[in-house]
């Protein structure tokens, strides 16, 4: 169910900074029409830290409504407060999400036992699948393959991981401990080729916000074992993978989407729009990928 190119969706805002529901509806539909195989609303790229709880829930509800069962919706339900994560996960299930994505708790830095407690409690509070989001670069903590294996063993609805460790060897380690059926999705566009070669089955992608068709074709080539074609597409996409992260995400993707006429280039403080020099580099990368003239 969860494989291929899955987009970590931006949340469009209008010029007054409010959630732009009309733009979001069109954006979600465009993603599906371009070949995206799954959608992740209200993750990091969706600026969830600056959404109110009501906005967070509304974004999920709209995404599910527009997707209409065409592709799975993996709703963001992360928090560094277990009770809050449970509440968000339960709302996502009630709204009709196909799965939830739960990030490792940030800032308060639980140990491995604390991670087990957090994820097992969230998983047992819902009946839909849960995907672990392991991103040490943002949360400071790193869930070990052993902790992941214990969670998979004890919680049958913990089905996969979005791995943003940047450690390609983790795919093989987690495959050995969690089993071959455990869904491993790359959390980094730039390393997705190697990730898939090690046994990954897709990517929760930022770049696919801007280049959904290319990212979908790249993942399809990987899953078909056609790594020559995948490498060709990777070469076309790599400058964009890099340029979009020259400044903190999602400032780059929002600028690029505004260049495509999809959304307004508006972020919520403390996120700010990109510098002119960064915009020039993103433009160049978009031209390299043949997304603009």
Curated annotation (Swiss-Prot):
Pathway: Amino-acid biosynthesis; L-lysine biosynthesis via DAP pathway; (S)-tetrahydrodipicolinate from L-aspartate: step 3/4. Coiled coil: none annotated. It is found in: Cytoplasm. GO terms for cellular component: cytosol. Gene3D superfamilies: Aldolase class I. Its EC number is 4.3.3.7. Keywords: Amino-acid biosynthesis, Cytoplasm, Diaminopimelate biosynthesis, Lyase, Lysine biosynthesis, Schiff base. One of its GO terms (biological process) is diaminopimelate biosynthetic process. The active site is at 133 (proton donor/acceptor), 162 (schiff-base intermediate with substrate). PROSITE patterns: DHDPS_2 (PS00666). One of its GO terms (molecular function) is 4-hydroxy-tetrahydrodipicolinate synthase activity. The keyword Ligase does not apply. It is an enzyme of class 4 (lyase). Pyruvate binds at residues 45, 204. SUPFAM superfamilies: Aldolase. It catalyses: L-aspartate 4-semialdehyde + pyruvate = (2S,4S)-4-hydroxy-2,3,4,5-tetrahydrodipicolinate + H2O + H(+). It holds the Pfam family DHDPS. Homotetramer; dimer of dimers. HAMAP family: DapA (MF_00418). This is 4-hydroxy-tetrahydrodipicolinate synthase. It comes from Brucella ovis (strain ATCC 25840 / 63/290 / NCTC 10512).
